[in-house]
Amino acid sequence: MKPKIYLDNCCYNRPYDDQSQIRINLESQAKLFIQKLISFETLELVTSVMSYYENSRNPDKKHREAISAFMKKHETMCVTENDTIWNIQGTIVSTGIKEADAFHLASAIFANCDCFITTDDRILKYRTESIRIINPIQFIIEMR
């Protein structure tokens, strides 16, 4: 069975960030490698309505369209709003995670993803037994 992953919007946008910082550059390379694995169908990609909503707010049209096209082409599931997700989100928000980030996490948990991949340090500090939260670099290292 292929690992099922959820990439948050920080990951999708990481290759468009300033690559002069080593951490950003390494995270970008790891994220692009993850995209290749998704394209080769080695990994299963889960998205959500929040993924599309946040991406629609990206001011760079070229980046917005590229990200949207990748998600549409490769997603195996797009999680939509439902009471279970709202309940999970509420629990996560109560720990101090922002609402949009909590919706992403709740969507990944609802879809039974193996990993939630993010570059956001605040989310990386969040702990739950429901899903593994991991940086793209660490994800690649552990896949070996």
Regions found by a protein language model. Give the residues of each.
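Short, well-structured N-terminal submotif of metal-dependent ribonuclease cores
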Residues: 1-47, 57-65, 137, 141-144
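Short beta-strand scaffold positions
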Residues: 7, 80, 99-102, 118
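Conserved beta-strand segments of alpha/beta enzyme cores
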Residues: 44, 75-77, 132
